[in-house]
Amino acid sequence: KHITTAEGGAITTNSKEMYEKLLLLRAHGMVKTPDMKPWEYEMRELGYNYRITDMQCALGLSQLNKLDSFIARRKEIAKTYDSAFKNTIIKPLYTFDSNSSYHLYVVLVDFTKLNISKEELFIWLREKNIGIQLHYIPINKQPYYKNLGFGDEQTPNMDRYYEECFSLPMYPLLSNEEQDYVIKALFEILNG
C-alpha cells in the first residue's frame, strides 16, 4: 500500500506450499508442466489474471527506493496527529509505534460527547475538502458475507468500533499546512 505499481503488487512468502497456491491464483489456476505437449495446460483451480506487466514492475521497483522516506514521513504525520489530539476525545486506534509503517491513521471518537453525529462530521469534513474515510465497514454488514450466513452474530466490540472510527488523511505528500488544516477543522468541532 505504501508504493504503487499503478495496479497489482507483490507478495512474498517463505512457504513453498503458499508459493505454489499463489502461482495458481495469479494465472487462472493454470499449470504447464515439462511433460505436457507444447499447447497443453491444466486448470487445477479457479484462478484470476493477477499478472502485472513489466512496466508496472519497473514502476514498483523505482518506488522501492523511496519506501524508507515514505514511511518516515508517515511516522512524522502520525506523531503530529498524536500530539495534536492528546487529551481530547479524538483517540488514535493505536499508540505511536516506531515499527509501524502507518498505512492508515484511524481515530476513535466518542460522539456522545459532541454536538454532531458521525455522519454530519464526515459530510462537514468532506465539504471542507478533507479526505477522511472509514476503515473498515465490518464484513458481517456486507451483503456478500450475509449471503454466506454471516451477520447475525453479536459483535459489540466491532459495532462500537464502527460507530466511533474514521481515518484521517495519511499519505507521504500530505504537507504540514494540509495537516494543520485537518487538525484545525477537527478542533472547530471539538470547541464548537
What residues fall within each predicted segment?
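Exposed boundary/loop context
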Residues: 1-2, 40
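Glycine-rich phosphate-binding loop of ATP-grasp-fold ATP-dependent ligases
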Residues: 2, 6-11
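PLP-dependent aminotransferase class I/II
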Residues: 14-192
